[in-house]
Amino acid sequence: MSIPANTIQKDKMMHSDYYTQSQGPTVEQQPEWQASVQPYSDPHAYSPSFYMNMSQVPHFLPAQVDPFIYPNTLGSYGGDKQVQCLWETNGQVCMHVCQNSGELSTHISSNHITHDSKFVCLWKGCDREFKMFKAKYKLVNHMRVHTGERPFLCDVCNKVFARSENLKIHKRIHSGEKPFQCTHNGCTKLFANSSDRKKHMHVHSSHKPYSCMYPDCGKTYTHPSSLRKHTKVHENEKKSQLSPEHDESSDSGNASIGTPTTDESLTFSPENIKRDQHLHTMHTFMDRPNPFMQMYQNQFSNPTYHMFMAKPDSY
């Protein structure tokens, strides 16, 4: 059975028209409202041409940012990142590129930290301000702060540490070892590290170094956990002060979100600030022009559209 030539031609034209429409209307075919709408552009999206020409625009001058920040990574997301050596000697920064933090530590130990040199950290921007270390290994351990190297791995939970002492203390969590005993007479409590024992010793003395930071409170405690429990009391008081205002606004039938309050103590609370930010965000979204909504409103108000709607009495 042969297909007529005009049928094939019409079929080709139909597919051609559909393909053209699927690519989107041209400028002449766009509705008037759509032609006036500017295409959306994300101001935070990366555009190579924008950043390359940014220095040529007068009001987009490069920001004065210190490039010698830790860590100075050159790689992309995922995997080991390339890092730069920022060791400074006689005003010259090394800038040697290493593939990872371990390679950077090896480079520093073999090239910059020698037995003949003084054990001083010359990393760009180091806050030690050229204070000397007593031994080379102490300087090597300090350099892990800048390089980010953590060579000591826990074989139980795979956590990594920069110092072997920290790994040793961490392993006591898994073993249950508590070698530090309270030295107070009659107290038999044991601790995994000396810092926890030091905090505990305040219980046996009148010294209370942890004080409440809330105004007009002045309470002091011997242990930070007691201070945290006390701080929650203040937080619950703040919430109870805000709850009557919330109930009053919800019962009024108004659903007024931004009801002003005369209590100055509640004006700058975190809850009020968060609620005010949500209010501004909601108004900004609602006031934003929506051309698609305008298109559907125009379509539904068109008399020709209602001619195709079924009448209720026709069923």
From Swiss-Prot:
Molecular function via GO: DNA-binding transcription factor activity, RNA polymerase II-specific; RNA polymerase II cis-regulatory region sequence-specific DNA binding; RNA polymerase II transcription regulatory region sequence-specific DNA binding; RNA polymerase II-specific DNA-binding transcription factor binding; zinc ion binding
Region of interest: Disordered: 225-270
Keyword Cytoplasm: yes
C2H2-type zinc finger span: 83-112, 124-146, 152-174, 180-204, 210-234
Localisation: Nucleus; Cytoplasm
GO biological process, one term: anterior/posterior pattern specification
Listed Basic and acidic residues bias regions: 233-249
Summary of the knockout phenotype: RNAi-mediated knockdown causes many hermaphrodite progeny to be vulval-less and so unable to lay eggs. Few or none of the Pn.p cells remain unfused in hermaphrodites or males. In some conditions, despite being present in their normal position at hatching, P cells fail to migrate into the ventral cord during the larval L1 stage.
Superkingdom of source: Eukaryota
Annotated PROSITE patterns: ZINC_FINGER_C2H2_1 (PS00028), ZINC_FINGER_C2H2_2 (PS50157)
Gene Ontology cellular component terms for the protein in this record: cytoplasm; nucleus
Keyword Metal-binding: yes
Consequence the record notes for mutating residue 187 to Y: In ot327; larval lethality. Abolishes expression of homeobox genes ttx-3 and ceh-10 in the AIY/SMDD lineage in the embryo, and also in the AIY interneuron at larval stages
InterPro entries listed in its UniProt record: GLI-like, Znf-C2H2_ZIC1-5/GLI1-3-like, Znf_C2H2_sf, Znf_C2H2_type
Biased composition (Polar residues): 251-270
Assigned keywords, A-Z: Cytoplasm, Metal-binding, Nucleus, Repeat, Zinc, Zinc-finger
Free-text function comment from the UniProt entry: Transcription factor. Modulates expression of target genes by binding to regulatory elements. Required for normal cell division timing and cell positioning in anterior lineages, acting in a cell-autonomous manner. Required for development, fusion and fate of cells of the ventral epidermis, the Pn.p cells, during larval development; acts in concert with homeobox genes lin-39 and mab-5. Required for the specification of the AIY interneuron.
Subunit structure: Interacts with TCF transcription factor pop-1; the interaction is direct and facilitates transcriptional activation; transcription may be repressed by beta-catenin/sys-1.
Name used for this protein in its record: Zinc finger transcription factor ref-2
Gene: ref-2
